[in-house]
From Swiss-Prot:
This is Pancreatic lipase-related protein 2. Residues 106-118, 270-292 are annotated as: Required for galactolipase activity. Glycans are attached at residues 92, 366, 441. Belongs to the AB hydrolase superfamily. Lipase family. Disruption phenotype: Suckling mutant mice show inefficient fat digestion associated with fat malabsorption and decreased rates of weight gain. Lipase that primarily hydrolyzes triglycerides and galactosylglycerides. In neonates, may play a major role in pancreatic digestion of dietary fats such as milk fat globules enriched in long-chain triglycerides. Hydrolyzes short-, medium- and long-chain fatty acyls in triglycerides without apparent positional specificity. Can completely deacylate triacylglycerols. When the liver matures and bile salt synthesis increases, likely functions mainly as a galactolipase and monoacylglycerol lipase. Expressed in acinar cells of pancreas (at protein level).
C-alpha cells in the first residue's frame, strides 16, 4: 500500500509553496461532516488548511473505517471477543472484568488489529497482571493513502472515547483505569480519544508517534500531555522524514519522552539497499520491516519491557551526546524512570512535561541493558599500546567482556568508560581484566589492573576491586573486593 504524504507538507521543505496554499485555503469557508453519536468533524483549521496539512478533506465515516474492538483477557488469551459500544450487551456477555485495568493497543498506518505484535503484547501482560487487553482494529481506515489515514485517526479516536464513556456511564468503570497504547498514527488516535475524554484517561503511551501531518501542529490535533493524567512517549525514528525517512516525531509530546539510542537509529536497523532506494510514496506493507525498522522498534521495546522491568532505565539528560559522554550518570537522587510498561511507577512522572530521558538498548532479540561506569587503574613496568577489557561477575550471572579503552596504556593511569551490560548481574562479586595489543612481542610484557571501580547506574552504588598482580596479554586477571 503506498504511503502518499503529499497532503502533509513540512516547514523545512517547500515552505513558499505551503504558505501560498495555506493562504489560499484560508479564504475558503470551513465545513464539517457529522457522524451520529460521534459528533461532527471540521475540515477547517487546525485540522486542515495548515502548512503541515493543507488538504481540506474529511475523515471517513465510521462505517467505512469499521473500527473493531478485539477483547483478550487472561481467560481468553488466544481468541478475541468482539465488543461494541453501541451494543453494551456484547460487553456484558464478554470476559471484560470491571475490577481490572483496561489497556487498549492501537496500531498505525497499513497495520491491523489482528497483527501478531498486538496479541504478543497482550500475552506478555497476562504473564504479569490481570487485565482487559483490547486490540483496536481500524485496518480499513489505515490501509489507504497516508494523508487520508492520518485524517481518519479522528474518527477512530472518537470511537474509543465513546466506548470508554459507555463503560463509565453504563457500568461505572472509571476512565482512570484506562491505558491507551498507540503506535505511529495510533498514538494520535489515543490523543484524540484522550482529548474527547477531557484528559481523564489514566495513561497514554505513544510508541513513536507519527510525524507527517502532526508535528508542529496545535495540541488538539496531535498527542500531547493534556490528553491523559500521564503521557509517556518512546521515540525511535525521529530523524527528519526528508531526507532520512524518519517517520516518528522528534517533538516532545509527553510528560516523559524517552529517546533510546538517541531516538534516530536503532541497533540492528542499519541502512540497507532497500531502505535507501525506496521512495516515500512507495512503501508497501511487505517491506515495512526493512524500510521502517526504526519505527517498529518502539513497540518491540515496550513489549520487551513488560517481562524485563529493570532493563530499560532512562537517564535524564539534555542531549544524547552528553549521555554518551558520561555527563548524565548515575541516576539522580529521585531515581530514573523505566521506559515502557512500568514508566508510571516513576514518582516524578507528572512533575512537569517534556522530561527527556536517554538510554541504550541491544539489537535484535535481547534489547535490555544495564548501565555501569567502569574505572580501571593500570599497573605494570612500562607504557604499552593496546586495549583493555573488563567482565562483571555477580550473584545473578556474568557479563561478556566490554572494551574500556583502546590506545596508549600507561601504568598508574586511570581509564573510565560507561558500559551497557546485556545481563543483570546483580550485586557484583568480582571482575576480570584482560589486555592485548595484537603485536608479537618477544619480551612478553605484563600489565594488570591494580584497582577497578564499578559504579551502578540505577542508584550510584560503587563496587571496588583490587589486585597486586600483572598478567601477560590475553590472560585473564581476577580482581576481588578490596
Amino acid at each position: 500500500m503506498p504511503m502518499d504524504v503529499r497532503g502533509c507538507l513540512f516547514p523545512s521543505v517547500q515552505m513558499l509553496l505551503c504558505w501560498l496554499v495555506s493562504l489560499l485555503l484560508a479564504t475558503v469557508g470551513g465545513k464539517e461532516v457529522c457522524y451520529g453519536h460521534l459528533g461532527c468533524f471540521s475540515n477547517d483549521k487546525p485540522w486542515a488548511g495548515m502548512i503541515q496539512r493543507p488538504s481540506k478533506i474529511f475523515p471517513w465515516s465510521p462505517e467505512d473505517i469499521d473500527t473493531r474492538f478485539l477483547l483478550y483477557t487472561n481467560e481468553n488469551p488466544n481468541n478475541y471477543q468482539i465488543i461494541s459500544a453501541t451494543d453494551p450487551a456484547t460487553i456484558n456477555a464478554s470476559n471484560f472484568q470491571l475490577d481490572r485495568k483496561t489497556r487498549f493497543i492501537i496500531h498505525g498506518f497499513i497495520d491491523k488489529g489482528e497483527e501478531g505484535w498486538l496479541l504478543d503484547m497482550c500475552k506478555k501482560m497476562f504473564q504479569v497482571e490481570k487485565v482487559n487487553c483490547i486490540c483496536v482494529d481500524w485496518k480499513r481506515g489505515s490501509r489507504t493513502e497516508y494523508t487520508q489515514a492520518s485524517y481518519n485517526t479522528r474518527v477512530v479516536g472518537a470511537e474509543i472515547a465513546f466506548l470508554v464513556q459507555v463503560l463509565s456511564t453504563e457500568m461505572g468503570y472509571s476512565p482512570e483505569n484506562v491505558h491507551l497504547i498507540g503506535h505511529s498514527l495510533g498514538s494520535h488516535v489515543a490523543g484524540e480519544a484522550g482529548r474527547r475524554l477531557e484528559g481523564h484517561v489514566g495513561r497514554i503511551t505513544g510508541l513513536d508517534p507519527a510525524e507527517p501531518c502532526f508535528q508542529g501542529l496545535p495540541e488538539e490535533v496531535r498527542l500531547d500531555p493534556s490528553d491523559a493524567m500521564f503521557v509517556d512517549v518512546i521515540h525511535t525514528d525521529s530523524a527528519p522524514i526528508i531526507p532520512y525517512l524518519g517517520f516518528g516525531m522528534s517533538q516532545k509530546v509527553g510528560h516523559l519522552d524517552f529517546f533510546p539510542n538517541g531516538g534516530k537509529e536503532m541497533p540492528g536497523c542499519q541502512k540497507n539497499i532497500l531502505s535507501t532506494i525506496v521512495d516515500i510514496n512507495g512503501i508497501w506493507e511487505g517491506t515495512r520491516n526493512f524500510a521502517a525498522c526504526n519505527h517498529l522498534r518502539s513497540y518491540k521495546y515496550y513489549a520487551s519491557s513488560i517481562l524485563n522491568p529493570d532493563g530499560f532505565l532512562g537517564y535524564p539528560c539534555s542531549s544524547y551526546e552528553k549521555f554518551q559522554h558520561n555527563d548524565c550518570f548515575p541516576c539522580p537522587e529521585q531515581g530514573c524512570p523505566k521506559m515502557g510498561h512500568y514508566a508510571d511507577q516513576f514518582e516524578g512522572k507528572t512533575a512537569t512535561v517534556e522530561q527527556t530521558f536517554f538510554l541504550n538498548t541491544g539489537d535484535s532479540g535481547n534489547f535490555t541493558r544495564w548501565r555501569y561506569k567502569v574505572s580501571v587503574t593500570l599497573s605494570g613496568a612500562k607504557k604499552l599500546s593496546g586495549y583493555i577489557l573488563v567482565a562483571l561477575y555477580g550473584c545473578n550471572g556474568n557479563s561478556k567482556q566490554y572494551e574500556v579503552f583502546k590506545g596508549s596504556l600507561q601504568p598508574e593511569a586511570r581509564y573510565i568508560r560507561d558500559i551497557d551490560v546485556d545481563v543483570n548481574v546483580g550485586e557484583i562479586q568480582k571482575v576480570k581484566f584482560l589486555w592485548n595489543n595484537k603485536v608479537i612481542n618477544l619480551f612478553r610484557p605484563t600489565m594488570g589492573a591494580s584497582q577497578i571501580t564499578v559504579q551502578r547506574g540505577k542508584d550510584g552504588k560503587e563496587f571496588n576491586f583490587c589486585s597486586s598482580n600483572t598478567v601477560h596479554e590475553d590472560v585473564l586477571q581476577s580482581l576481588y573486593p578490596c
